[in-house]
């Protein structure tokens, strides 16, 4: 098992970073949505991490021709998707598995979606059940709740009106993809807006998705093929956030992160840092599918904060935020975050158990935790095979020495994380 030793940073840093991993959510969607076109899509700066390369591989198994040169990808789909001769391996990616459920539900053929041991333990009923209710044939372990999942595509899905009990961009996206091949207009609603890359990208490609006065997304079935993509994938704000926290916890430090998506549903964690006292500036430069620009983060005194709203907008950043909270003045509290229990690990448990090793005072709740800020102490951290836990506590190592066990998981989303971390010294 690979281990990562991080030494305390003894000097401030002032850097610009333009090599942070490309956005994972957008990269997944670029690969998948290209299948709705009948022309070649051109994707620059595609994320070349394990999860997104697995998605490219699945797209290829479904019949598309792929040319790749580093992070530049061309995808030429076939007129109809091909039934694969082998299982479709999503690796560690819940996004890939759940979105492919929606995409494949109405594709003629049989498909088996599987993944690594962590993904095979994550709940899939939240997406499989609503898809089944509109005619999809999906089965799996534990009464259809766990992968491997077996999908037999049906020719025509029923249009639906669905108010989701779970605020999840993955569930929403799966239902939207299924609705594109339904035999009428479908309506989808969530209680709290989740990240909206799917809606933005599909509308940009020519699909019709409209919000009505009742808060439903009205999804019109496709009449033909969508336009191909010609896109440069921006920097991932969730990956960039580790270095925002690095600046926030390191005295007199500053970081400028270049070419990030500034989508409001993706920068909420930066707004929380702002509320904690950190200086955060957003500099928008362009808007193609997504607003894109730079984010500047400057160290300032950290104060405790309560986080209970817009949780779906910062669910991936909460482990890193917990490091800032541990070094802030006063108490911080996270609530309404039960979704953390079913991520790559039980992230509430993973965060608080590792904070305990760092001698941080905390209280754990079913839907979050409270942290008494002050200091961190050196510890040997168990990542639980979760890339965000591994990277969050690696950033904590800038404040005090830290050893992280099982760091191979970082490759799933941010292959050059260690290289950028080393550049701070």
UniProtKB/Swiss-Prot annotation:
The keyword Amino-acid biosynthesis applies. GO terms for biological process: amino acid biosynthetic process; aromatic amino acid family biosynthetic process; chorismate biosynthetic process. SUPFAM superfamilies: EPT/RTPC-like. PROSITE patterns: EPSP_SYNTHASE_1 (PS00104). It is an enzyme of class 2 (transferase). The active site is at 316 (proton acceptor). GO terms for cellular component: cytoplasm. It comes from the Bacteria. 3-phosphoshikimate binds at residues 24-25, 29, 168, 170, 316, 343. Its EC number is 2.5.1.19. Disulfide bonds: none annotated. Pathway: Metabolic intermediate biosynthesis; chorismate biosynthesis; chorismate from D-erythrose 4-phosphate and phosphoenolpyruvate: step 6/7. CDD domains: EPSP_synthase. GO terms for molecular function: 3-phosphoshikimate 1-carboxyvinyltransferase activity. Monomer. NCBIfam families: aroA. This is 3-phosphoshikimate 1-carboxyvinyltransferase. It comes from Aliarcobacter butzleri (strain RM4018) (Arcobacter butzleri). The lineage of its organism: Bacteria, Pseudomonadati, Campylobacterota, Epsilonproteobacteria, Campylobacterales.
């Amino acid at each position: 098992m690979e281990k990562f030793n991080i030494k305390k940073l003894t000097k401030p840093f002032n850097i610009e970073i333009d090599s942070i991993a490309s956005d994972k959510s957008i990269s997944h969607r670029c690969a998948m949505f290209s299948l709705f076109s009948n022309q070649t899509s051109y994707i620059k700066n595609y994320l070349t991490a394990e999860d997104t390369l697995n998605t490219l591989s699945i797209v290829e198994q479904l019949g598309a021709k792929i040319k790749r040169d580093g992070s530049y990808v061309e995808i030429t789909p076939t007129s109809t998707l091909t039934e694969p001769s082998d299982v479709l391996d999503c690796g560690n990616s819940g996004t890939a598995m759940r979105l492919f459920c929606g995409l494949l539900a109405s594709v003629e053929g049989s498909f088996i979606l599987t993944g690594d041991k962590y993904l095979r333990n994550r709940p899939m009923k939240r997406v499989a059940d609503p898809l089944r209710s509109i005619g999809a044939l999906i089965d799996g372990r534990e009464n259809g709740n766990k992968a491997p999942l077996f999908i037999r595509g049906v020719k025509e899905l029923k249009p639906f009106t669905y108010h989701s009990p779970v605020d999840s961009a993955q569930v929403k996206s799966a239902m939207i993809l299924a609705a594109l091949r339904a035999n009428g207009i479908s309506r989808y609603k969530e209680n709290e807006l989740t990240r909206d890359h799917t809606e933005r990208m599909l509308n940009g490609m020519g699909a019709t998705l409209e919000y009505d006065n009742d808060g439903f997304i009205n999804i019109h079935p496709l009449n033909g093929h969508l336009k191909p993509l010609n896109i440069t994938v921006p920097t991932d704000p969730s990956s960039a956030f580790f270095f925002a926290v690095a600046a926030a916890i390191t005295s007199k430090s500053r970081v400028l992160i270049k070419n990030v998506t500034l989508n409001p549903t993706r920068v909420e964690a930066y707004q929380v840092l702002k509320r904690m006292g950190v200086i955060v500036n957003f500099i928008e430069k362009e808007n193609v599918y997504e607003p894109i620009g730079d984010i500047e983060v400057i160290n300032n005194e950290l104060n405790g904060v309560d986080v209970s709203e817009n949780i779906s907008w910062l669910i991936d950043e909460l482990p890193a935020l917990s490091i800032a909270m541990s070094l802030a003045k006063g108490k911080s509290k996270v609530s309404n975050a039960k979704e953390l229990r079913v991520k790559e690990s039980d992230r509430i448990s993973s965060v608080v158990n590792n904070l305990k090793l760092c001698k941080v005072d905390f209280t754990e709740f079913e839907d979050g935790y409270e942290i008494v800020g002050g200091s961190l102490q050196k510890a040997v951290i168990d990542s639980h095979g979760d890339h965000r836990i591994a990277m969050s506590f690696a950033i904590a190592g800038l404040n005090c020495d830290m050893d992280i066990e099982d760091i191979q998981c970082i490759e799933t989303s941010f292959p050059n994380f260690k290289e950028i971390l080393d550049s701070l010294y």
